[in-house]
């Protein structure tokens, strides 16, 4: 195979460390399938030893994917490595990612180990991992704050023990492009190996240089880039993989190497992660933001109309942004709807299409044109409600007095059982959320509430995102409906359901 830049996606592991992001089991599977469709080389599916839930997710992903390598994270602990092996053993290409911190501040304050003890641990655990895995990746955590001589010693020890991939994490986003690229040059020149070693870059965005550092690493000899979709991750996030992939494509004249990313799946992948994570993509976000291909200046508009390349270095179609969609309407039939689903890349069973078509007709009766974004919302909303353990069955609101509202909420469980309660509050939303809290017998704190319109216009569907805290645990919820209050109620129920399914029904799973 011709040499290319490997894309190592850690959206489901490092990306899920974003505050408030808790993907469900089903969401992780759907994300994994879409990432494979997008064309990532390796998917870091999770940290199997951290919890039973994480183990089961990694195991399910390993059994599901057909072309993408599945990797699990492990500390320098044999039990961690054993967990990765058990979780990924049915993957088509299993990999393990072993790490230990190497910087002075981590050795002194976190590990309380000497440099010699760290070297011994690297040798012991990388060689142990090599007994089970053909591909072993080693990461010296906080590498960019590690003295270069010791970093070289750690890397050489890992290679001697059997590591085939060396990842250099800029764990706290401390480095800058010139410095980071130079680290790779020094390492590739200093280490010795009888077999091919792939160097990998893992950058955080604390100083806003994660993508620039990743590209500098390629110039320094890296052939694998790690990151997340939309750059999600703890603190300021990780390197945005869609930006890396497009930079390699657009500037192949400079880098000379491309990724194997299916660029046309980029926007769809970004939208999926945004919806499940509950994190809106900024309008001015490179590649996938709403303004990425917009031109406000009259001079720019005139130039683009005369010749697109005057102000655009890539086309919207390249990343899967459809600018020539033909909207459906209330007169559109089942065949036209089925063809639209197919054109949008969905493979949906005929019996499921019947339900979706009914929802489409309900929306078409309320608005003149049903756009592609409406169709996406119908499908994702339907999938979300189908997999939900609780659904909104009925909502009634009534004005009481002095600004107080009364809300009656009826919720149906998956087993058919119905729960109902009522409450009052200073406004409709407060009343609704108080009633839901009473149903679930939870004292939840609402910390974020956001309404997005699925499309433009007064007849748009509302997509509500909420973040709540229950028992010091932060969870998110999504609700879609033409009625903003119903969408708000659905989102709040969804957040409660996520907490219950992840932290109560599976009590003891997470650590």
From Swiss-Prot:
Pathway named in the protein's UniProt entry: Amino-acid biosynthesis; L-leucine biosynthesis; L-leucine from 3-methyl-2-oxobutanoate: step 1/4
Cofactor(s) for this UniProt protein: Mn(2+)
Gene Ontology molecular function, alphabetical: 2-isopropylmalate synthase activity; acetyl-CoA C-acetyltransferase activity; manganese ion binding
Residue numbers spanned by region Regulatory domain: 391-511
Localization in the cell: Cytoplasm
Residues binding Mn(2+): 14, 202, 204, 238
Keywords: Amino-acid biosynthesis, Branched-chain amino acid biosynthesis, Cytoplasm, Leucine biosynthesis, Manganese, Metal-binding, Transferase
Record-annotated Pyruvate carboxyltransferase domain positions: 5-267
Catalytic reaction(s) noted: 3-methyl-2-oxobutanoate + acetyl-CoA + H2O = (2S)-2-isopropylmalate + CoA + H(+)
Broad class of where this protein is predominantly found: cytoplasm
EC number: 2.3.3.13
GO cellular component terms attached to this protein's record: cytoplasm
InterPro entries registered for this protein in UniProt: 2-IPM_HCS-like, 2-isopropylmalate_synth_dimer, AIPM/Hcit_synth_CS, Aldolase_TIM, LeuA/HCS_post-cat, LeuA_allosteric_dom_sf, LeuA_bact_synth, PYR_CT
Biological process (GO), any one: L-leucine biosynthetic process
Gene3D superfamilies per UniProt: 1.10.238.260, 3.30.160.270, Aldolase class I
Assigned protein family: Belongs to the alpha-IPM synthase/homocitrate synthase family. LeuA type 1 subfamily.
Function: Catalyzes the condensation of the acetyl group of acetyl-CoA with 3-methyl-2-oxobutanoate (2-ketoisovalerate) to form 3-carboxy-3-hydroxy-4-methylpentanoate (2-isopropylmalate).
Assembly mode: Homodimer.
Official protein name in the record: 2-isopropylmalate synthase
Organism: Staphylococcus epidermidis (strain ATCC 35984 / DSM 28319 / BCRC 17069 / CCUG 31568 / BM 3577 / RP62A)
Gene of this entry: leuA
